[in-house]
């Protein structure tokens, strides 16, 4: 390929966008638009690359894909084949992971308000539960007694991260990382974690395994992850000193960003996102130093990357409709995709780089500024002030890096059906999510018979 957007997505000698061995134009013709397209081999490449980066620096590392980024069972099967576990949030993601054959020993269940059905399924299956409150600790113990099987549990810590009180977040704007992280609903402060551990150690129905924390993506500054590791290890040392219990594993969650030079993420600021090696070096070096400092041995390190693994595995193909120009050279290019399909554009001012599928590496002289807009009854700006080659009705535009939080967040505003998803492996292209129909969109509605009567 004459230009690469990722290892398996790029531009061929004709200037066409290709996903592995398939021309994006052919995929749009064969499967219709809008269309999510995923590269199987890019998924495999990413898992292997991040695993290699971490294990080269800290061999006892387990990769748990954050399923909320892309919970398609076909995608989950690929992660299984590559040896990755999974982080699940709620009954649906847990059920899909187990349905896809994920090793329960590599699955974690998260959530701040877990219900009995999902907790019971986790206990029965041997999935580890990240406890979010003292109340949940007792609830899980009772459910385990009813099931007749010990439940594996980790307390979810609510770290203070005071070192980050003066560090400005990239997103959301105007927030410092430390106070912002402390303001969310997840996890327990130290005294509750201590009491949770006491109760778990005293219970015949709870198997206390490790500690869990997830800070999320606030900044591309690697100091965020160093601070999480330092404080998580310090909490582990305090628990050892007070209880005589040492965590067998430390889960530091996700929050690993991903970016490209053309831009990605909130306000396009993930151009500066660290790569896998930079993340691994920062986390592993800090972890090794802190473990040695406190004499905590070598627990299993668990990380939960989502977007960092799934963003660049996919594109969203969309077809051009009306092209409208306003006097003064303002041009709107209407496409059949919308913010329904990439809702982070609306909620986080997310930037997805866009290319013309038939001219994906244009000469600068061919470019003009346009707004790419969708069909919804909102402004529905998919990409403002984008430099694109000339576009006309029927052309195909591709939004890059849509493999994470596209399909999983897609909505049906304006009663718009959601796209299909196709998985490409070499020359092969297979539907892994069927295109929604209008019948699917309206099928749950019910009109009481009395409202059908005239008058």
Labelled PLM ranges:
Residues 1-131, 137-153, 202-207, 385, ...:
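A charged N-terminal "starter" segment
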Residues 1-3, 162-319, 414-416:
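Active-site loop/helix belt of alpha/beta enzymes
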Residues 9-11, 17, 186, 372, ...:
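Short clusters of hydrophobic/aromatic residues that line enzyme substrate/ligand-binding pockets
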Residues 66-72, 91-92, 112-114, 132-136, ...:
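Active-site beta-loop-alpha junctions enriched in small/polar residues
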Residues 85, 108, 128-130, 154-156, ...:
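Structured core elements
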Residues 102-105, 147-150, 203-206, 238-246, ...:
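Secondary-structure transition/capping motifs at alpha-helix termini
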Residues 119, 141-147, 185, 199, ...:
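A generic local secondary-structure boundary/capping motif
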Residues 282-284, 288-292, 296-455:
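Charged (often Lys/Glu-rich) extended helix/loop segments that serve as interaction or gating elements
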